[in-house]
A protein has these predicted regions:
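Hydrophobic alpha-helical transmembrane segments
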Residues: 51-67
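N-terminal membrane-targeting/pre-transmembrane regions
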Residues: 1-45
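A short, sequence-level motif marking secondary-structure junctions
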Residues: 13, 113-119, 140-144
């Protein structure tokens, strides 16, 4: 690798929420939980049938509340608690820098072994570097352009595979 990539960004509430949402959406997409919304909708339909046939609205009420939560309030509630925890975080408003060069990958001048990264995910919001028990989010705005972001992801993917 001849080109050195260097990105830096300030870790503020907006970027924190972007990263949390990107990770949440990616992890939900690959989880069985993604089917819960469909189950709640099916329960609502069953509740409508019960309400029309037997006049009972218990199932309809409960399933409607679940659908509203799942599709309307789930992220808002999560966002509230994330913001609350971020306000007390020691990482709030810190500057981070990531360097990728011939010597390796560095986060705030600390080396990251490519063997410790088990997956890299590129989203519109940024790049997620997944480790065993956590992840690092690098917002798209930290990269100079889309080509640098694509190159960063491509190089990391090659290094993870051991090439």
């Amino acid at each position: 690798m001849s080109k050195s990539l260097h990105v830096s960004y300030n870790w503020n509430t907006k970027k924190f929420l972007q990263g949390a949402k990107a990770a949440y959406d990616y992890e939900l997409k690959n989880s069985r939980k993604r089917f819960l919304g469909w189950i709640f909708i099916a329960l609502t339909q069953f509740g409508v049938v019960l309400a029309l046939k037997q006049g009972t609205i218990g199932m309809l009420t409960l399933s409607t509340i679940l659908v509203l939560y799942w599709y309307g309030f789930r992220w808002k509630i999560r966002e509230y608690f994330l913001i609350k925890s971020f306000k007390n975080s020691p990482l709030k408003d810190k500057s981070f820098e990531v360097k990728l060069n011939d010597e390796g990958l560095f986060f705030n001048n600390s080396p990251i072994d490519f063997k410790d990264i088990y997956e890299i995910v590129s989203t519109d919001e940024g790049v997620l570097l997944y480790f065993i028990d956590n992840y690092i989010f690098i917002p798209s705005s930290a990269f100079e352009n889309l080509e640098d972001k694509s190159e960063f992801v491509k190089i990391i993917k090659r290094k993870i595979k051991g090439e």
